[in-house]
Structures are given as structure tokens and as C-alpha cells.
């Protein structure tokens, strides 16, 4: 039920209505509302009940096991949120003077240094407001670097066929042509194809390591040498940093620039389209091109660096300092765990993934790459289940919802047929993993004996299978368009 269906003329929550509304605003008259907004007329109790019930119908990290591959749905520690909400942080105005913001600036400066140490890259900018924007910033810096050298013939970005969809999107937005590199049968990049396609037009290559196949790219040093010898740069998509945190640094692997997804590796909140934060880290040669602002330290304290400090900067990507509240959460998460704790993150993440992969193969599931160990995530292929029992990966995913488990990522990467990409983050216990295995075993038995149960799933949720194509092509967000 939509909240408009609860509406009744004259009903209102008076406690929430301001006694007087000031009209001393500077909105031009042509932009001022001429009629009252068409809001639902509901009591406060109705509103509270409605949205509380909606929240109870959602799947979330706080309520359900959430093995969504390539998303690192780890628990967000409440103490971190509390620390980031200290009055000195949340009451600071974005335009406050540097000398009135020394504590805030010092915190961000330390965060820059922590990220530099974690990534093995000397330059860090915190300003991008999402992983995708950080990715765009990284590719834009690659372009600025080549242009500053007069190397304008480099108009190609190499991208593996198993890459995240944002990779080619960022490359195209920066004016590059995307050149796809195939994956070899063992899950690594096809080096022979890379050798054929890298050349004088190569601006760079975008990689995730471990890849979205859940496999560590074993020839990364050779790849780095090939691209660098051709004059290109290496971009690291930080989506899977959780798998190698504290073990190996992207800078040490030969990468020149990367973005970090704070909502994945560093436990800031997911969802809702934001707020997000996607800091970028760069090697020495790209420091001049970093997006502003960044925090610098001088004898007089901490200050915002300006265009005078970075005249070749690609510019600003956001107002002020990006999403400061999210950056603070990542900083306190690092403080809470410390160096040893961050190392344990990757150890437990990879342990969980390999344990779960082993247990699921014991109950009949097929690993997409049975000869390889998982990193922090892995892929099951349900191709045989589809051929033998006419049930799909989507059927398995929908049935999991009936058992109170959020579905893994389905049909991604596209090169693995009928796949589930499963990522059990380090915050999940062995008991939770064992419970998931038991559910998966039950669902597979249902697929064999009663496949129609899977085909009609979910059975217990208020919403069944939606028409995704219709929703995408016939966007309807106006209640009154169909109810008048």
C-alpha cells in the first residue's frame, strides 16, 4: 500500500507543523509555488506505522545475511557512526575558515596519509563523492597526464571482459575508445591478446585485482610491464580491495591511480544512492593532476590546497570537501581496527569465501573455476542445474529470499553462464555461513524434486517477480497520473 492510499482530507499531524513560516526568502517569484503541495493527509501514527512496516519488509545488513558479490556488504560498526557525529564535526560549516577547522582538517589530512599507506601511492584526494566519480577522476587524470606531454594520440583504454560496467562508462565519458581484453580459460587475462592490443594508442588499462571472477590476477607484474613499456598507465578499480587489505598494495603491483569504495572496504553505509565517497590515490607522476581540494600541512597548521598549489589539477568534482561525514566514518573505522585489524579483514574475508566455496561444492554446486582458490568472493555456475532441471540462477536467487537470505549477485560477470557471485564478508560468523550452506542444499534438493517451487519464488514476500523491462522502459513515479 502506498501512503497516498491512507490519505484522508483534513487529517494532519499538527505536532510537526511549524507555528509560523517566514517569507523572508530570496526565491524569485517565478519559481515560487502557486498552489499547495499535494501531500498525503495522514496522522503521525499512520506515517510512523507505514514507514516502519516498509522498513521491516526490506532486506538489510542489520537483519539478513547479504552475500551480494562485488559489493562487500559488511557490518557498519555503530561506534564509528557515533564518533563521526561528534558536535565538532557535524556543526562545522563547510565555509568555515581554516583556522577555525584545524581539528577537522587534521582528521582529513591523517585519512589521506592512511590511504596513502594502505594503497602504496603517495598522492590522495578525498573529494570524489562516490566510487564511480572517483573512477571518472582517475581516468580524467590519465587523460590530463598524456595531454600535458603532448601525447594526444593515446585514445584507447584497455578493459577486461569481466570488468565492472562503470569502467567502460568512465573511459567513454573521458573521451576514450574502449578496447576489450578477453579472459583466458583459467580466469586470468589473456596475455597474448593483451600483447596484440597494447600499443602507441594505449592510454591505460583498467583492472580490478582480484577480478570480478573472484580470482587474483597472477600475472599482474607482467601486465604492468607491458602497459608501462607501451607508454600507458594502470588504473586500479578499488571494488575488491577488501581481499588484499594489508597483504599487497596496488602501488606495489604497478598501478598508477585508483579509487577506493569506502562503503565496501571501510564500512561506510551502503544504499539509497548516497551519500558516498570515492577517494582517489595516485602515483608520483599523477600528483599534479589530482582533483581539488586536498589538505596540506604547513608550519602554520592545516590548510586547503588551492589551484596555486596544483595548477594542472583536473579541477573540482564536488562542492566543498565531498561527503565529509562518510570520510570521517572511514577514518574512525581505520582507527578502531588499527593496522593489525585491517590485515585481519582481508584474512577473514578470504577465509570465509574459501570455506563457503568448499562447503557448497560438497553439497553439489559447481565452481566456475574449480582449479583456483577464491579471493574474497567466488562464482558458482548453475548451468548444469538449468540443463538438467530447467531452473535458472534467477530461480535460485528468488528462492533464497523465502529463506531470509538476500540473493547473491546474479548473471555477473556475463562471461560465466547462469552464475551466482557470492561474497561473505569478514564480519560473518562460521555459524552464519553454515546456515547459508544448509539453505542452499535445501534449495538444490527442491530444484531436483520440485522445480516449480523455485520457478514461482518468492512465495513469502509482499512483492513477487517484477517486470524489470517494463519498469525500465515505462518509468512511472507519479501517483496522481494513474489515480485521478
UniProtKB/Swiss-Prot annotation:
Pfam families: Aminotran_5, GcvP2_C. Keywords: Oxidoreductase, Pyridoxal phosphate. The modification N6-(pyridoxal phosphate)lysine is found at residue 264. It catalyses: N(6)-[(R)-lipoyl]-L-lysyl-[glycine-cleavage complex H protein] + glycine + H(+) = N(6)-[(R)-S(8)-aminomethyldihydrolipoyl]-L-lysyl-[glycine-cleavage complex H protein] + CO2. It is an enzyme of class 1 (oxidoreductase). Its cofactor is pyridoxal 5'-phosphate. GO terms for molecular function: glycine binding; glycine dehydrogenase (decarboxylating) activity; pyridoxal phosphate binding. GO terms for biological process: glycine decarboxylation via glycine cleavage system. GO terms for cellular component: cytosol; glycine cleavage complex. Its EC number is 1.4.4.2. The glycine cleavage system is composed of four proteins: P, T, L and H. In this organism, the P 'protein' is a heterodimer of two subunits. The glycine cleavage system catalyzes the degradation of glycine. The P protein binds the alpha-amino group of glycine through its pyridoxal phosphate cofactor; CO(2) is released and the remaining methylamine moiety is then transferred to the lipoamide cofactor of the H protein. Belongs to the GcvP family. C-terminal subunit subfamily. This is Probable glycine dehydrogenase (decarboxylating) subunit 2. It comes from Legionella pneumophila (strain Paris). The gene is gcvPB.
